[in-house]
Each structure stands twice: as structure tokens, then as C-alpha cells.
């Protein structure tokens, strides 16, 4: 993997920085593991905008990822590493000994031809998936389940990981990259190691059009709008917002907690916020 600073042949390429991985597969993805997805453009079933700054972009197939890793005791060989337009991490196509192929999140350090395993008897090696009760304390893990059998939900982005801090009774404590410490059931599964493509954060888009390819639309400042469109809008000439920063719907935007899921609050031992 290399970081390439593009030659400034145009204003759009002057600040562009690419992350190039020559190990990625250059052909088409595995057709049996593709699914269609239509662009929602940030709208719900009523056509109302529920997520701003989304729309357009290139058409993409969804790659069906195996987040459960439930084929216990069956060795799998990494056939190739691939780019996935739907996520920051790369994915790996693995071939199981029984002939089935699946996509998984590509862990850091996993190479083509390497053998992976799942289950409680799998060795503690990068890319193997085990129940947390079988993982030694202090191990770096990723793709962590929040409920047993539901599939990985935490630490799935490029370069992310978590650390298994302790086990007590039916629950273990896991420290996430944000600093939050959560309780996770010991029957939940996790994958050893870190997520690959850790240099993803070093890339520079370079121009606005590259974000439009990705389906990201422009972000307009509230003070540049009319008062009917935003609480910061209006005024003669360039004026300040006149109040603390808020969203278009009046919710404070700096430091205001918006978490509403009280059901799982008991699973948070230490919040990522220090205060």
C-alpha cells in the first residue's frame, strides 16, 4: 500500500492524495455475492429529506458481507482482496473447504493464500473469529457483535480496532477506538486484529466533483440561507448567527448529547466524553 501525491496538472488534482494498493483485485467482483441497491438520495418512503447532503453519485452493487462468520471448524483460504465502494475498509473473498465463497472485512496483515478459521477452537491469529470468552484479555479485536448471533456491528471501518480489557461473569469489557468502554456478552463473536486499509484517512479528495461521484452533495452554511430555511439565516449583508450554533431544526450542534437509546445505556461503562 502506497500514498501517492498526484502531480498538479489541474487545480482539481493539485491537492489530491491517493492511497494505492497493488494487491487489490483488478477484475469484476464475485457475481454470486452481489446485490442491487437503489439510490435513496437521503429520502424516506414519503419522499421527505431525512439525511441531508446525499444524492447522485455512481451506481454501485452491494457486496454481501459475512458479518456472522458462523462456519465453525471449516478452514477458509483468502482468494483475493477487493475494493468495496460501500465502505472504507477493503474486503476479502474467502473460499471455504466445502466450496462456499464469502466476503469478509479484510483484516490488517491478511494476504492472499492465507488460511482463516472461525469458532471457539480457532487459533489466536489475525483474521480468525472466536467468541469473546475464548479470546485472551488484552487482545486487539475488530468486527465485534453487540448481540450473540446478530453479526458484527462495532469496529468495522478502515483502520479501526478495539481492545478486550476484562471478563467478569457473562460479560466482557471492550475499549473502542473512541475511548468508550462497553460491556459485551462473552458469547458475542469478534475477529482478531485490526481492520485493514489503515491509510484510508490520509487520502485527500482534491475536488468537489470527486465527492459528487460518491453521492455526497454540498453543505450550505446556515448564515447564507434565508430565515425560513435556517435559524441562522437572514439579516442585511453578512451577519453573525446571533445565537448558539443549532441545526436547521433548532437542536444545539456543539456538545449537545442526542443519544436516545436508553435500553442499552447500562452496557456503557465509560462514555467517550470525559465530562
UniProtKB/Swiss-Prot annotation:
CC per GO annotation: large ribosomal subunit
GO molecular function, one term: transferase activity
InterPro entries: NA-bd_OB-fold, Rib_uL2_dom2, Ribosomal_uL2, Ribosomal_uL2_bac/org-type, Ribosomal_uL2_C, Ribosomal_uL2_CS, Ribosomal_uL2_dom3, Ribosomal_uL2_RNA-bd_dom
One annotated GO biological process: cytoplasmic translation
Keywords: Ribonucleoprotein, Ribosomal protein, RNA-binding, rRNA-binding
Listed Pfam families: Ribosomal_L2, Ribosomal_L2_C
Highest taxon, organism lineage: Bacteria
Region (Disordered): 224-257
Summary of subunit composition and partner proteins: Part of the 50S ribosomal subunit. Forms a bridge to the 30S subunit in the 70S ribosome.
Functional description taken from the UniProt entry: One of the primary rRNA binding proteins. Required for association of the 30S and 50S subunits to form the 70S ribosome, for tRNA binding and peptide bond formation. It has been suggested to have peptidyltransferase activity; this is somewhat controversial. Makes several contacts with the 16S rRNA in the 70S ribosome.
Assigned protein family: Belongs to the universal ribosomal protein uL2 family.
NCBIfam families with a match to the protein in the record: rplB_bact
Designated name of the protein: Large ribosomal subunit protein uL2
Organism from which the protein derives: Burkholderia mallei (strain NCTC 10229)
Gene name for this UniProt entry: rplB
Amino acid at each position: 500500500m502506497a500514498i501517492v501525491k498526484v502531480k498538479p496538472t489541474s487545480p482539481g488534482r493539485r491537492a489530491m492524495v491517493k492511497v494505492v494498493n497493488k494487491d487489490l483485485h483488478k477484475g469484476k467482483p464475485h457475481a454470486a455475492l452481489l446485490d442491487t441497491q437503489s439510490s435513496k438520495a437521503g429520502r424516506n418512503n414519503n419522499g421527505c429529506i431525512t439525511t441531508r447532503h446525499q444524492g447522485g453519485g455512481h451506481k454501485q452493487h452491494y457486496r454481501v458481507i459475512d458479518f456472522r462468520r458462523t462456519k465453525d471448524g471449516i478452514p477458509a483460504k483468502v482468494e483475493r482482496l477487493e475494493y468495496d465502494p460501500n465502505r472504507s475498509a477493503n474486503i476479502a473473498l474467502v473460499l471455504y473447504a466445502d466450496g462456499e465463497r464469502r466476503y469478509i472485512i479484510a483484516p490488517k496483515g491478511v494476504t492472499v493464500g492465507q488460511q482463516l478459521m472461525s469458532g471457539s477452537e480457532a487459533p489466536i491469529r489475525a483474521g480468525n473469529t472466536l467468541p469473546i470468552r475464548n479470546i485472551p484479555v488484552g487482545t486487539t479485536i475488530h468486527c465485534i457483535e453487540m448481540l450473540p448471533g446478530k453479526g458484527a456491528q462495532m469496529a468495522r471501518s478502515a483502520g479501526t480496532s478495539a481492545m478486550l480489557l476484562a471478563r467478569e461473569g457473562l460479560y466482557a469489557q471492550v475499549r473502542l477506538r473512541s475511548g468508550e468502554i462497553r460491556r459485551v456478552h462473552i458469547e458475542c463473536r469478534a475477529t482478531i486484529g485490526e481492520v485493514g486499509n489503515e491509510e484510508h484517512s490520509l487520502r485527500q479528495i482534491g475536488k468537489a466533483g470527486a465527492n459528487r461521484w460518491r453521492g455526497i452533495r454540498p453543505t450550505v452554511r446556515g448564515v447564507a440561507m434565508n430565515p425560513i430555511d435556517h435559524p441562522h439565516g437572514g439579516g442585511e449583508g453578512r451577519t453573525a448567527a446571533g445565537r448558539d450554533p443549532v441545526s436547521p431544526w433548532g437542536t444545539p450542534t456543539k456538545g449537545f448529547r442526542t443519544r436516545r437509546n436508553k435500553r442499552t445505556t447500562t452496557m456503557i461503562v465509560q462514555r467517550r466524553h470525559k465530562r
